[in-house]
UniProtKB/Swiss-Prot annotation:
GO MF annotation: an example: magnesium ion binding
Protein's name in the database: Virginiamycin B lyase
GO process annotations (BP): antibiotic catabolic process; response to antibiotic
Species, as recorded: Clostridium beijerinckii (strain ATCC 51743 / NCIMB 8052) (Clostridium acetobutylicum)
Entry keyword Metal-binding: yes
């Protein structure tokens, strides 16, 4: 497969871009972990930035809601933030102190669901900012990323618990153990085949779990690739960032893996998303936003 990668510098130096998502405004929105800003980039590479009110908020993952608002996690500030496409920001405090909010997604109920890394809970926040929390069965599970599955249930990774969990709209939790010990699952996404696909940052594998809980794992070609985030591409394959090897990876639903080198050395790719142009967009902690175009 032929591809082309473009990279766009962020105006604020040392901004530390981390999470990225596509908005309803034909642009991509991303978090700037070090600059404490939310960024917006058009498919032509034009960038705007918005400062978050809470200082050193620890901006992490960002997701677009169906009503157009962008929601993001503030790991250090212990808040969930919301920004409109006009740049207006509101922040909501989480009841559990030092909960470490990280992964975030929209649920089938229209609410925003998120993980609490250190709080060991899954949270739900309404559009009005009302928060409900559900404690996980096992301590120190370190719930990381979360996504809505094809079955209408929220699925999440347990980075330290070495499990994939799911939670219903009623707060009922089920967990499935990953075969590889200490795999360190992080990113998770709903695949084109109806299954959930996730990355193993320590196991150096891509995992697949059916909605019935059956797990398969696929080895990556590059050792110590440290896969971080994953998304379903417009081509029907899964795309993921390889933070350790400075690559963007691709895996088909049959398990065939390809890897593509990022032009900038040591770019530290993290978040990944599909843009309105159907390209793969990703956040590089080296202060750039990348765009991978399928030729």
């Amino acid at each position: 497969m032929n591809i082309k990668i473009n990279e766009y510098y962020i105006p604020t130096s040392l901004s530390g871009p981390y999470g990225i998502t596509a908005g309803i405004d034909e642009a991509l929105w991303f978090t700037e972990n070090k600059a404490n800003k939310i960024g917006r980039i058009t498919v032509k590479g034009e960038i705007e930035e918005y400062l978050v009110p809470s200082q050193d908020a620890g901006l992490s993952i960002i997701v677009s809601g169906t009503n157009g608002d962008l929601w993001f996690s503030e790991y250090n500030a212990n808040k969930i933030g919301k920004i409109t496409i006009k740049g207006e920001i509101v922040e909501y405090s989480i009841p559990t102190a030092d909960s470490g909010p990280f992964g975030i997604t929209e649920g089938p109920d229209g609410a925003i669901w998120f993980t609490e890394l250190t709080g060991n809970k899954i949270g739900r926040i309404s559009n009005l900012g009302e928060v409900i929390e559900y404690k996980l069965p096992n301590d120190s599970s370190y719930p990381s990323s979360i996504v809505c599955g094809s079955d209408g249930v929220l699925w999440f990774t347990e980075n330290q618990g070495n499990k994939i969990g799911k939670i219903t709209m009623l707060g009922e939790i089920t967990e499935y153990t990953i075969p590889t010990i200490g795999s360190g699952p992080v990113g998770i996404t709903s695949g084109p085949d109806g299954a959930l696909w996730f990355v193993e940052i320590n196991g150096n594998r891509i995992g697949r779990i059916t909605t019935e809980g059956i797990i398969n794992e696929y080895d990556l070609k590059t050792v110590k690739a440290r896969p971080h985030a994953i998304i379903t591409g417009s081509d029907g394959a899964l795309w993921f960032t390889q933070w350790g090897s400075n690559q963007i990876g691709r895996i088909t639903t049959s398990g065939e893996v390809s890897e593509y080198e990022i032009p900038t050395a040591n770019s530290e790719p993290h978040g990944i998303a599909v843009g309105p142009d159907k390209a793969i967009w990703f956040a590089e902690e080296c202060n750039k936003i990348g765009q991978l175009i399928l030729l």
